[in-house]
């Protein structure tokens, strides 16, 4: 969590510098934080995995209206979402490490 806070701090400093260079007030920036966006994305990934698991359980129990192709498609969507989340995390960690290794 400290890495996310560090990245968020660097991003907010860069945004403030960019706004100051453009002559804008730094207090008028949006209130959506990087950590908030990241948390929302992780929640969506979790929701997609939960929905796929529930649908697979319903199919296994033989509930009517649940087709195998729908279950497989939802499970694949959940898998792709998870892989995307892992890749985003890897890119964030690499960017954070690069910023931290910069000399001031």
Swiss-Prot record:
Question: Which InterPro entries does its entry note?
Answer: FliE (IPR001624)
> Does Transferase show up as a keyword for this record?
no
Q: Which cysteines are joined by disulfide bonds?
A: none
Q: Where in the cell is it found?
A: Bacterial flagellum basal body
GO CC terms for this protein? bacterial-type flagellum basal body
Taken from the record, one Pfam family name reads: FliE
Biological process per Gene Ontology, one example term: bacterial-type flagellum-dependent cell motility
Highest taxon of source: Bacteria
The molecular function terms of the Gene Ontology recorded here are: cytoskeletal motor activity; structural molecule activity
Going by the UniProt record, its keywords in alphabetical order are: Bacterial flagellum
Instruction: Spell out the family assignment given in the record's similarity comment.
Output: Belongs to the FliE family.
Report the protein name in the record. Answer: Flagellar hook-basal body complex protein FliE
Species per Swiss-Prot/TrEMBL record: Salmonella paratyphi B (strain ATCC BAA-1250 / SPB7)
């Amino acid at each position: 969590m400290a890495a996310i806070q560090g990245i968020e701090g660097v991003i907010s400093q860069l945004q403030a510098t960019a706004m100051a260079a453009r002559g804008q007030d730094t207090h008028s920036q949006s209130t959506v934080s990087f950590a908030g966006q990241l948390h929302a994305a992780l929640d969506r990934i979790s929701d997609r995995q939960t929905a796929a698991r529930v649908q697979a359980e319903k199919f296994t129990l033989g509930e009517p209206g649940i087709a195998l192709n729908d279950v497989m498609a939802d499970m694949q969507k959940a898998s792709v979402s998870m892989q995307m989340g892992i890749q985003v995390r890897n890119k964030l960690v690499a960017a954070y490490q690069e910023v931290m290794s910069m000399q001031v």
